[in-house]
Amino acid sequence: MLELVNLSCGYGAFNAAADFSLKLRPGTITALLGANGAGKSSTLMCVAGHVDLQAGKILFGEQDISQLPATERVRAGIAISPEGRRLFKDLSVQDNLRVGGLIHPSSAYAKDRDRVLDLFPRLGERMASLAGNLSGGEQQMLAIGRALMLNPKL
C-alpha cells in the first residue's frame, strides 16, 4: 500500500531524514521509533506532502505520489493528524469536523461524523464548543477525528 524508496526529506537545506526505505502492507500496524530529532514526524509529514521531498520516491498503491501536492495526496486517501493539532480554534467542534468533508467531499457527512463520534463520544457532548476551549485531550481527539472524516486509506 505504501512504499518509501530511498526517501530523503527536509526543510530547505536541512535534511531531516536521509535515504530511508520502508514498505507497509495493508492491514498492518507499523511504528516509527527513534530518538528526538531522528526524522520520524518529518517522514510522515513528507508522505502527506507537508515537508519537502529531496530525493527518492513515495509509492501509494500503484501510484507514484512523490510530486503530488498535499491536497492531491488527501484525495488519494492520505490523512495526517499533526503534532501541533492545527485546529481552527475559533470554529466549533462541529465546524472543525465539517472541514474534513470540505477538503474531501462526501455525500455521507452524517455517517462519517457519527463514526467519529462513536470513536470519541466526548466530542459529541462538545459539538457547539469552540475548539480553542477544549482540553488538550479533547483537542487531540478532534484533530484525529477531523483526519478520519476524510475516510483515509492511510
Predicted regions: what they are:
Residues 147-148:
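ABC ATPase C-loop
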Residues 130-134, 138:
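Conserved ABC ATPase signature
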Residues 48:
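Helix-to-loop junction immediately C-terminal to a conserved catalytic motif
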